[in-house]
Amino acid sequence: MISNPIPWPNGARCACVISFDMDADSLIHIARPGDSHDRLYPISMGRYGPQVAVPRILETYRRLGIKQSFFIPGWCIETYPDAIEAILAGGHEIGHHGYLHEDPIDSPDQRRWFEKALEAHRKYCGGNPAGYRA
């Protein structure tokens, strides 16, 4: 038993955080940069997220009156601006999730990718992200 319990709103006994990573088809492009455009099956699976799942998730959370956190790579922010616009229009937040799941070799390389993702956030989301997840 906790000796100093946290007082949750409305008498709740706990809190739960659910968040989404919208990686879309970014993973195939970093894993197979030379021929990713020919790999239609994984690309199609990846596009399901921003094109089908996100609208369904947003509608569910709209009905429930819940706000959500999405962590989205910068490449996906640039590639799926309609999904980004819908997420933001619903009052949800978008966190920094790298640029393209790159594997930076050194600190300058890591900073370059991090900054590139920040640029996407500023351009498409209107400012800096509220948080970061690797």
Question: Where are the regions that the model predicts?
Answer:
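Catalytic alpha-helical scaffold of carbohydrate-active enzymes acting on polysaccharides/glycoconjugates
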Residues: 1-133
